[in-house]
Each structure stands twice: as structure tokens, then as C-alpha cells.
């Protein structure tokens, strides 16, 4: 578990939870990190099997009206759309797939053990008792484990309690509410953990 050190660096911390120090070496400290940026951090750290599953290719223009995004939106939109164009090229190390994914499918992938899963969520959705205000609080978590019978996920949360090393158990329905909130685009990153899918010469710097 790697805790985040600033309120905005959960993406970088999640990359370190999966790949360790090599991810920290590859990641630039950027206040605004989109999921396509996080995919770039993984590939810069040496991961070759990286897949971004999302319901929106590029930037959803409606996000310009959301308080969470508006401060960085104009600065980010051109960069993020360009990153998506590069990622959809035939020779890209990142595979981008436009689709929605069911909780049961996420559980099957995680339980297989061959891939790590990082999800973009509305942080407030992971705490059903928290009073929700208007808007969106984007946050990245690692889906560490799943229990199909109980229909629960074990999440590794970089903003979680140090006493549990950030672990938190949530129901599938709670997780679905958090990851399907407006602002997430239902983004999921699947990163191969197989040794053959890593470049031993990494990390390089991801800008």
C-alpha cells in the first residue's frame, strides 16, 4: 500500500500500489491526472499490457460545467484528447476500449490474478453514510480482491486508514454507484501483472 501524500495524487499512489517504486520514478507530479495519464504512467514504468476501458473516448464536454474539473478543464482538454488519439493508434502500448463493464466481470478479472484493476470513482460513493453535496470528487482506488458469494470487493484506497493499509470492503452495488457517478466515465484500467509484459529497461519519465 502506498498512501497519497497530497489530496490530488491518488493516481500516482495507485500506480505505486501496483508497481512499486518504479511507478513513482516514472510519474510526474501533476495536480490534474486523467485516467489516460495514469495509463501512460504504467507504460512508462514498464507495463506493456495496459487496457483502458471507458464509456467515453476523449473528454466529455459536459465536464467543463462540473466544479471538480472546471479549474483545470481548459488546460487539460487539448492534452487529454491528444493522449487519447495517441492511445488509439495501432502501435500504442495502451489499448483503449469503449464499453461498460459489470461488477461480476471485474471480479472475474481480479480473481484470475493476472491483472491489476484501478478504478476512477466518486470518493463519496464509497462511504454511504457520508452526506453528499452537489458535484463530484474524483478518486482512484485499486480493486485488490473480490468475493463473488458475498458480492463484495476489497479496495486498496491511497487515502484510506493506515491501520488497515488502505483496505476497505464495499459491496458491488456501493462500488457501482461510486464508479458510475457522473464524472468518472466508468473508467477502469487493467494492467497485466505477468513478467513477460514488463520492460526491464523501464522506468522512463512520463510527462
Where on the chain are the PLM-derived regions?
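Noncatalytic regulatory segments and standalone regulatory/sensor domains
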Residues: 111-112, 122-138, 144-207
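Active-site nucleophile-adjacent alpha helix/oxyanion-hole segment immediately C-terminal to the catalytic cysteine
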Residues: 1-59, 111
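Active-site-adjacent substructure of cysteine-protease-like catalytic cores
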Residues: 62, 72-156
Amino acid at each position: 500500500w502506498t498512501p497519497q501524500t497530497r489530496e490530488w495524487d491518488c493516481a500516482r499512489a495507485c500506480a505505486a500500489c501496483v508497481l512499486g517504486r518504479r511507478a513513482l520514478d516514472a510519474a510526474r507530479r501533476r495536480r490534474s491526472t486523467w485516467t489516460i495519464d495514469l495509463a501512460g504512467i504504467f507504460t512508462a514504468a514498464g507495463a506493456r499490457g495496459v487496457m483502458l476501458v471507458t464509456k467515453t473516448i476523449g473528454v466529455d464536454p459536459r465536464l467543463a460545467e462540473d466544479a471538480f474539473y472546471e479549474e483545470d478543464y481548459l488546460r487539460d482538454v487539448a492534452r487529454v484528447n491528444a493522449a487519447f488519439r495517441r492511445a488509439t493508434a495501432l502501435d500504442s502500448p495502451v489499448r483503449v476500449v469503449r464499453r461498460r463493464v459489470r461488477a461480476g466481470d471485474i471480479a472475474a478479472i481480479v480473481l484470475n490474478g493476472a491483472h491489476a484493476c484501478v478504478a476512477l470513482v466518486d470518493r463519496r460513493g464509497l462511504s454511504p453514510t457520508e452526506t453528499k453535496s452537489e458535484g463530484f470528487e474524483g478518486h482512484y482506488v485499486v480493486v485488490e480482491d473480490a468475493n463473488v458469494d458475498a458480492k463484495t470487493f476489497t479496495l486498496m484506497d491511497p487515502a484510506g486508514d493506515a491501520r488497515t493499509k488502505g483496505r476497505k470492503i464495499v459491496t458491488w452495488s456501493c462500488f457501482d454507484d461510486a464508479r458510475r457517478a457522473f464524472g468518472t466515465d466508468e473508467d477502469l484500467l487493467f494492467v497485466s501483472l505477468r513478467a513477460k509484459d514488463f520492460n526491464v529497461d523501464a522506468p522512463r519519465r512520463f510527462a
